[in-house]
Amino acid sequence: RLSVCGTVNDLASMGARPRYLTAGFILETGLSTDVLEPIVCSMAETAKEAGVTIIAGDTKVIEGKGGLYINTAGLGDRAPDCEISAGNLHGGDAILVTGTLGDHHAVILTERMQMKTTLASDCAPLNHLVEALLAAKLPVHTIRDITRGGLATVANELAAASGVSITLSEEALPVREEIKALSGILGLDPLTMGNEGKMLIALPAAEAETALRILRALPYGTEAEEIGCVSTGSGVHLKTLYGGRRRILPLRGEGLPRIC
């Protein structure tokens, strides 16, 4: 599922409608077909959900201990007048997220630590959310899927690319209570924890409520929130619960665990 969603969401973040995927499998010797078959079926189901077709594939077998690697590439089409890009943030834009932060990262971590929780991965194809916003003719400026490095890293990359400042509201950040508790215990920051089914979306503040209404009416967008704004300046800052303001830096080094 992740191999399909990752590529579909990358295309959607560019304002493109995903159409076709190719898949390459590197299989280690000893891999059981009982393991491989459910994975392939999951890919097929996810591709169907996203409305894309897997049109080509290849396999290679290497020495190993029964593991596998999957690589996908995708093709999509994008309207000629689409201006969605990382460097297109404007002063006065509202910053939205399509749902809660850190879910996938937390699930991978708790699984590896053999901790029992009720958390579930948010891995999902998000292209239908983007298509709905564009179908409504909303002037979306920037979209980015929030993956490795979390919201902090994504926001810093976008602010730097656009030459603007982003201010986030701590009060508005959607984070599950379980993830807040886990973060407190392990010394993690939900802002640097990755997702595989969430997006940051920027558009004029006057259109934010319309965009939220559209997102919340669709699967994978029911918990969408407006979390910040764009202004002149540089960097990313957080307005804290106590009225303070602090600088948010991107994740340094390699985030652990690796989420993809």
Place the predicted regions along the sequence by residue.
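Small-aliphatic-rich amphipathic alpha-helix that forms the alpha element of a beta-alpha
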Residues: 1-21, 41-49, 128-135, 153-156
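Glycine-rich anion-binding loops of enzyme active sites
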Residues: 17-108
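General beta-strand structural signal in soluble alpha/beta enzymes
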Residues: 23, 53-57, 96-99, 142-146, ...
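Active-site-proximal betaalpha loop/short-helix elements
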Residues: 28-30, 119-195
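Helix N-cap motif at beta-to-alpha junctions
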Residues: 203-209
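Short amphipathic alpha-helices in soluble, non-transmembrane regions
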Residues: 210-220
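Acidic, Ser/Thr/Pro-rich beta/coil linker or hinge segments at domain junctions
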Residues: 218-260
